[in-house]
Swiss-Prot record:
CDD domains: UDG-F1-like. Belongs to the uracil-DNA glycosylase (UDG) superfamily. UNG family. NCBIfam families: PRK05254.1-1, PRK05254.1-2, PRK05254.1-4, PRK05254.1-5, ung. The gene is ung. This is Uracil-DNA glycosylase. GO terms for biological process: base-excision repair, AP site formation via deaminated base removal. PROSITE patterns: U_DNA_GLYCOSYLASE. GO terms for molecular function: uracil DNA N-glycosylase activity. It comes from the Bacteria. SMART domains: UDG, UreE_C. InterPro entries: UDG_fam1, Ura-DNA_Glyclase_AS, Uracil-DNA_glycosylase-like, Uracil-DNA_glycosylase-like_sf.
Amino acid sequence: MKEITINIDKIKINDDWKEFLRDEFQKKYFLEIKKQYLNAINQNIIIYPPANLIFNAFNLCPLKEIKIVILGQDPYHQENQAMGLSFSVPKNVKIPPSLNNIFKELQNDLNITPAKSGDLSFWAKQGVLLLNSILSVEANKAASHSSWGWQEFSDAVIHKLSNEKSGLVFMLWGNYAKSKEILIDNTKHLILKAAHPSPLARTGFLGCKHFSKANEFLKKVGKIPIDWKIV
């Protein structure tokens, strides 16, 4: 069997992030992710998001512009939903319940009219890293790639951003996201925690005012606040 290696030049991620995460791409766990991915593709298993969107969160959010990290768990597993951005769905796709609650909170917090589109690309382009902890999923099988090793990669991203950047905002929604708090230096960054926006979660997300709190912090550290409208 041909040995699988990592050709960093072929990873579909922008050069700024490629250099920032170069060491991670060369680690054994990332090679294991690639093996699992290729095995699934060779078995004609459908994986979401499409290959060109797996690193979309990074490709839309320039490293030098990063201001906020919103951590999700894993991609949507139904057709035409996953686009490589946590909580986001493409234009003209029905808005999922969690994202509906996010839009409700935006209205409560900043009086922003709920959007008709669930595409959060505009946030990403302003410096919001919409990062899922797990970056791929098998069609119609939630959390099916949770054993692949993606968490090690996303944990490394969070930890490296915490160490090498300053004045970031980390939004941690739900117990899973809150467990990542240990990766973040709270003397350099603002950590905002709340319940998950899912309607199935206990109350605690609506009313958190994370969006206004994030912008107040960004202004305090001399950064341009985020325009949270969806365009």
